[in-house]
Amino acid sequence: MPSYIVVGGQWGDEGKGSIIAYLAIHDKPEVIARGGVGTNAGHSVFINGKKYAVRQLPTGFMNENARLLVGAGVLVDPEVFFHELEHLKDFNVRGRIGLDYRCTVIEPGHKELDRSNGYLHGKIGTTGSGCGPANADRALRKAKQVKDLKELEPYLTDVAQEVNEALDEGKLVLVEGTQGFGLSLYYGSYPYVTSKDTSASAIASDVGIGPTRVDDVIVVFKSFPTRVGAGPFPTEMSEEEAERMGLVEYGTVTGRRRRVGWFDFEFARYSARINGATMLAVTMLDKYDKEAFGVTDFNKLPQKAKDFIAEIEEKVGVPVALIKTGPELEHIIDLRENI
């Protein structure tokens, strides 16, 4: 598995961060590269009971031997970047991070426009992080790049070059996606989408990896999908039902309450197909079956949980390789050896 990509299969907030964190520690990749849109998506991980949330830097930061990279396709907010360098100082991130010199900069004006635009903020439900306006300026070829900012000079690199050289040397490369397939500008429920494609193909392009150099694609699904902001959500349940089932969540970036729904097998199959999934990861199985909490051996899962995993594999047509049964890093079942 010289290179693999982890992407969300629903509308974001699938728990990609917890899967990426596990892979970063367990598999020990030498390079961890982040693709995706920008600072409009947050990944949360729990390490020794402490919660860390990142919006700009790779979620695999806790692997202190890995080179951390942010691909050319990612938007960079200097304010968020430097905040996270300080936030993660215990992990020596500052000495390991590289930004592709071609990344577009999110400027204060982009954030102001994002938050003040009635259409984006009201109808679409933007996070207000400035990503949409920044990508618009990029498409118009008038945006700044990180190479234009002196304060970012120490961190500049050619991410595509680094990643491909690492692959040439047989190193393990982990690529992180952000948000989810259902928010893709191309394949999501337009116009209630993000400002670019979020599929595995796009994430590979973000960091400069050609399609023939991707060995595995892990698509992450949450047992009860969630969505922040407006847009179609066919299996959505009522807020009252979500409260009764203990499924109330709030967005990492926006703080807004997430809409909750039942697992949509048809959408999951479509998502896995377009992303080219070779493996699936299922998170928050303990929310589906509370007796599954903390279980690390598949054979010890309660039957209800086993049946749910079997149904996903049958209806989606892709094997489930990783199962999260709780918030901590060690709350996971790894079935990759059986695939």
From Swiss-Prot:
Its EC number is 6.3.4.4. One of its GO terms (cellular component) is cytoplasm. It is found in: Cytoplasm. Its cofactor is Mg(2+). This is Adenylosuccinate synthetase. The gene is purA. GTP binds at residues 12-18, 42-44, 258, 284-286, 324-326. IMP binds at residues 13-16, 40-43, 127, 141, 179, 194, 256. Its main location: cytoplasm. Plays an important role in the de novo pathway of purine nucleotide biosynthesis. Catalyzes the first committed step in the biosynthesis of AMP from IMP. It holds the Pfam family Adenylsucc_synt. It is an enzyme of class 6 (ligase). Belongs to the adenylosuccinate synthetase family. Substrate binds at residues 252-258. It catalyses: IMP + L-aspartate + GTP = N(6)-(1,2-dicarboxyethyl)-AMP + GDP + phosphate + 2 H(+). The active site is at residues 13, 43. GO terms for biological process: 'de novo' AMP biosynthetic process; IMP metabolic process. InterPro entries: Adenylosuccin_syn_GTP-bd, Adenylosuccinate_synth_dom1, Adenylosuccinate_synth_dom3, Adenylosuccinate_synthetase, P-loop_NTPase. Keywords: Cytoplasm, GTP-binding, Ligase, Magnesium, Metal-binding, Nucleotide-binding, Purine biosynthesis.
